[in-house]
């Protein structure tokens, strides 16, 4: 697909690096302006990293480090 809608990014997370729910600046790179978690095809993460990222974002939302939705977006 030469005219793909999704452009793959180079992941800022190296394989083996932990994804921490307290690292809000890193997590913000993987959510949209509306607060949705970006899919793996856009983030360029491995499947394990994507699962860890999803868990970290959900934990950060529970402890109010990230919003569940962003009404300004």
From Swiss-Prot:
Q: Which SUPFAM superfamilies match?
A: Ribosomal protein S18
Note whether Nucleotide-binding occurs among the keywords.
no
RNA-binding as a keyword of this entry, yes or no, is yes
Question: What's the domain of life for this entry?
Answer: Bacteria
Q: Can you list the GO cellular component terms from the UniProt entry?
A: cytosolic small ribosomal subunit
Q: Which InterPro entries match?
A: Ribosomal_bS18, Ribosomal_bS18_CS, Ribosomal_bS18_sf
Q: Which PROSITE patterns match?
A: RIBOSOMAL_S18 (PS00057)
Mind telling me which Gene3D superfamilies this protein's record contains? Ribosomal protein S18 (4.10.640.10)
Report a single Gene Ontology molecular function.
Answer: structural constituent of ribosome
Keyword list (alphabetical) reads:
Ribonucleoprotein, Ribosomal protein, RNA-binding, rRNA-binding
- Give the UniProt record's GO annotations in the biological process aspect: translation
Protein purpose:
Binds as a heterodimer with protein bS6 to the central domain of the 16S rRNA, where it helps stabilize the platform of the 30S subunit.
Record-linked NCBIfam families: S18 (TIGR00165)
Spell out the family assignment given in the record's similarity comment. Answer: Belongs to the bacterial ribosomal protein bS18 family.
Q: Subunit structure, briefly?
A: Part of the 30S ribosomal subunit. Forms a tight heterodimer with protein bS6.
In its UniProt entry, what is this protein called? Small ribosomal subunit protein bS18
Lineage of origin: Bacteria, Bacillati, Cyanobacteriota, Cyanophyceae, Synechococcales
